[in-house]
Each structure stands twice: as structure tokens, then as C-alpha cells.
Regions:
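Transmembrane alpha-helical segments of multi-pass small-molecule transport proteins
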Residues: 9-17, 43-44, 113-141, 156-162, ...
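A generic transmembrane alpha-helix motif of multi-pass inner-membrane proteins
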Residues: 33, 345, 349-350, 381-444
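Membrane-interface "cap" regions at the ends of multi-pass membrane proteins
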Residues: 1-59, 65-69, 78, 176, ...
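Hydrophobic transmembrane alpha-helices that form the core helical bundles
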Residues: 33, 52-130, 134-138, 143, ...
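Helix-loop-helix junctions that connect adjacent transmembrane segments
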Residues: 4-5, 40-41, 120-121, 150-273
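TM-loop-TM module centered on a large, flexible mid-protein loop between adjacent transmembrane helices
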Residues: 73, 80, 111-116, 225-288, ...
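C-terminal membrane-solvent junction of multi-pass transporters and transport-like membrane proteins
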Residues: 147, 183, 310-319, 354-408
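Membrane-interface loop-to-helix entry segments
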Residues: 121-172, 183-184, 224-228, 343-357, ...
Length: 444
């Protein structure tokens, strides 16, 4: 396969933005489910306890091993092919849940304009979202990056306008009450952490396209440094201003247009239209950017001989068109299935894969101390291990608290374990029919 380096810093910042966030969408359900005070506290805590350690570790790994396949390559270098396959498999399973959500999100905001869409029409819209994003991806990484910039600016401008319009109407503390009435504190904390974590995960996703990034050893860490504050500020500023100027108890999933009507006074109606359009744009851009990232996992595994060779082929643009098309076909099938109750399982599978990546940095630092890129965390091995332990503790807390909520927690944990448990037998099948790895994984 021959790839083409076309992503510079700014497009990569917005690809990361849509790999992780896409705007404050779903924050409204976090506030409604757990209460504004707890929601705001969680939105401050997760970036410090999860995202900051993750971005630092991902930045060093991406700088150290700037290869197509990203985290799959890091785990392969540290732990070998078995654990690399598990990492890729877990990623693929949670991507099926993840990618089924965005067409649903698109339909939610489309419902603001067309509230009576039937099931067949919604599924048709979902397919249009999937294959519209696929058409952009087939043109290569550069069009995905450029479209991400345009979509990101449109979404961020909408929420900036809402913030400015809501400020004159702020009439109460946005963090009151701390907990939603009638909620069990531990159950609310577990659910809130899971929802918030889902809104902050994915900083490693775009590492899979590093073979298509210009000067990736420097560009990926630099893009992370811009994207993290952009995402965090977007969540906090929007939630604070809207909660201070509206009744949080009436918030609901997909409810930003209604929040704009309640919080923005005379500007409520035009802002509601803007945010409904922004929700649709964000959903399409999320699918678009994540298809770019997720499709490179079968590409990397195929280049190692663990999947059919045709998935590693690239076209004249340097695009792995077969991997993109096969990924889109799977996501189209799973768009028929409702995964609304499996967001916690999605988070757990991602976290399991991420912990393997953290372990990769620790092992590579110890085993190959001379292996380094343009960026390195300015800490010794012990401090880096402690840094990686912080999000690991957050994960254990979430698992423990999730068990307090039998409606969501226990089924999600069982689903995550079942999905992960399929990895070893699938690896055995893959190695039984393994092909010779491709020798050339170069980029132009």
C-alpha cells in the first residue's frame, strides 16, 4: 500500500475535534440525568483526570511511532500480534456501537424540521448520512480534514452565539441543584461519569491515519494541544450559560433547539434553527471523521496478513478505498440496530483498549529507552506510570459505580465482556489463515 501525506495541523485539529466531541451535543442529557451541579463538576474533573493524561500519553506514542494504524502499531510493538489484534478487535466492536449513534443523532435534529418522519424515512436518512460521509472519505484524508474545519466552525459559532444570547437572561446559579431530585448519588455519579467519559474519549482515534499526516511526529502532539482546550471549553461554556438562563429539568436528549428557545429570548427561534442544523452537521462530521479513523484498523490488520489482503489496497489518491467501503457496509447494517442502552459498554471497551496503549508506553520506555520522537513527556518512567494510573483508577471507579445501576451498568459490563471475549478465538482463526505481511507501508 502507498499512502499520501495530506493532513497538516489545522485539519488534524478538527478531525480530532470530531473524533472526540463534535460539540456539546449529549451534554444536555448528562445535565438532565444527574443534575446541573454534578454534571458541571464531572465536566471539569474528566478532562483533568482522564483527557489530560490520555492526551499526554497518546502524544508521546504518536510522536514515537508515527505509523499508519496508530494505536494498533503501538500495541504490536510493545506486546506483540496477539494483543495488537485484541486492541484492534475491541476498537472495531465499540466502533459498531459508536457509529450507529450518529445517524440517530442526525435524525433527532432533523426531527426539529420534520417531526413526523416514519421509520423507513429515518433509516433512509441514516443511510444517506453513512454514504455521504463515505463519498467524502473515498476522496482521501485531505477532503475529510477540510470538511471537518468547515463543519467545526459552523457548530462552534452556533454555540458561541447561544452563549452570548443567553448571558443577559441568566437568572440563577447554573450549578443548582447539585443532584437531580430522587437520584441515588452513587448511581448518578456512575451514569454521569460514563456519559461524560463518552464525550471525552477518542484522542487516540486519529492516530490510525498518521501515515497520511505531514510530519506526524510533531503534528499529532501539536494538534492534541489545540483540540483538548477547544473541546473542554465548548462543553463547559455552553452548559454554564444555558443552565443559568433556562430550566435544566426540562432538558432532554437532542434538546438544544428547545434550550435555545428558552434561554435566548428574542433570538431563541433563529438560534434554535441554527443549533438544529448544527446538530445535523455535527452528526455527519462525526461519522465522516470517525470513518476516516476506524477504516484504517482493517487496513493495518490486513497489511499484517490478519485480514484479507484486498483491505490493504490503496487507490491512485492513496486512499484505502476497500477498507472504507467494507467499513461503511458494516455500519449500514448496524444502523438498523438500537444501541441506546450500550453507551456504557462502548466506554468500557474503549477504555480496555486504551489501557493496553498506556501499558505500551510504559513497556516501550523501559525496554527501548532510545526510542523517541519529537515529543516526550518530561517525566521519568515512574511518574509516567503514575500518570497512566490516574485514568485507570477512573475506569475502575466507573465500573464499580455502574454496578450500582442495574438498569444500565450490569448489562453494559456483561456486553463489554462478551464482546472482548470473542477476540482470542477470532485471533486463532486469523492466524490459522494468515497471509504474508505486506513489506511496504510507505507514504508519499
Amino acid at each position: 500500500m502507498r499512502l499520501r501525506r495530506s493532513l497538516s495541523t489545522l485539519p488534524l485539529v478538527f478531525v480530532l475535534y470530531f473524533n472526540v466531541s463534535g460539540g456539546p451535543f449529549t451534554i444536555e442529557s448528562l445535565v438532565a440525568d444527574v443534575g446541573p451541579g454534578l454534571a458541571l463538576l464531572i465536566l471539569v474533573a474528566i478532562p483533568l483526570l482522564w483527557s489530560l493524561p490520555e492526551t499526554l500519553i497518546v502524544a508521546e506514542l504518536a510522536s514515537m511511532l508515527p505509523e499508519e494504524g496508530g494505536y494498533y502499531r503501538w500495541v504490536h510493538r510493545a506486546f506483540g500480534p496477539f494483543w495488537a489484534f485484541q486492541n484492534g478487535w475491541w476498537t472495531w466492536v465499540y466502533s459498531l456501537v459508536d457509529m450507529a449513534i450518529y445517524p440517530v443523532l442526525f435524525n433527532q435534529y432533523l426531527g426539529f424540521f420534520f417531526p413526523n418522519l416514519g421509520t423507513a424515512a429515518r433509516w433512509g436518512v441514516s443511510l444517506a448520512v453513512i454514504w455521504g460521509a463515505t463519498a467524502i472519505n473515498l476522496r482521501g484524508a485531505r477532503p475529510v480534514g477540510r470538511s471537518s474545519i468547515l463543519c467545526g466552525l459552523f457548530v462552534m459559532a452556533g454555540f458561541m452565539a447561544l452563549t452570548l444570547a443567553a448571558l443577559p437572561h441568566a437568572n440563577h446559579a447554573p450549578w443548582s441543584p447539585f443532584l437531580a431530585p430522587g437520584k441515588n448519588p452513587l448511581g448518578a455519579l456512575g451514569l454521569g461519569l460514563s456519559i461524560a467519559l463518552w464525550n471525552y474519549i477518542g484522542w487516540d482515534n486519529a492516530s490510525t491515519v498518521q501515515g497520511e499526516v505531514i510530519d506526524p511526529s510533531r503534528t499529532y502532539p501539536r494538534a492534541l494541544a489545540f483540540a483538548l482546550p477547544l473541546v473542554t471549553a465548548g462543553y463547559l461554556v455552553s452548559a454554564l450559560s444555558a443552565a443559568a438562563a433556562s430550566d435544566w429539568s426540562k432538558w432532554h436528549e437532542g434538546g438544544w433547539p428547545d434550550i435555545a428557545l428558552a434561554a435566548a429570548g428574542a433570538l431563541g427561534r433563529p438560534l434554535a434553527i441554527w443549533l438544529a442544523l448544527a446538530g445535523m452537521v455535527s452528526a455527519l462530521a462525526l461519522f465522516n471523521a470517525l470513518l476516516l479513523s476506524y477504516s484504517r484498523i482493517p487496513l493495518a490488520m490486513a497489511s499484517d496478513g490478519l485480514l484479507p489482503r484486498f483491505l490493504a489496497a490503496t487507490d491512485s489518491r492513496g486512499t484505502p478505498a476497500n477498507a472504507v467501503l467494507v467499513s461503511a457496509a458494516f455500519y449500514s447494517l448496524f444502523a438498523l440496530v438500537s444501541f441506546s442502552g450500550l453507551v456504557v459498554a462502548d466506554v468500557l471497551l474503549y477504555a480496555m483498549a486504551l489501557l493496553l496503549e498506556f501499558g505500551s508506553l510504559i513497556l516501550l520506555r523501559r525496554r527501548e529507552p532510545a526510542l523517541r520522537g519529537a515529543y516526550r513527556i518530561p517525566l521519568g518512567l515512574g511518574a509516567v506510570t503514575a500518570l497512566a494510573a490516574v485514568p485507570a483508577v477512573v475506569l475502575l471507579v466507573i465500573v464499580g459505580l455502574s454496578l450500582q445501576d442495574p438498569e444500565y451498568g450490569t448489562p453494559a459490563i456483561v456486553s463489554a465482556l462478551l464482546g472482548a471475549g470473542l477476540g482470542p478465538p477470532l485471533y486463532w482463526l486469523a492466524t490459522r489463515f494468515k497471509r504474508e505481511p505486506l513489506g511496504d507501508r510507505s507514504s508519499e
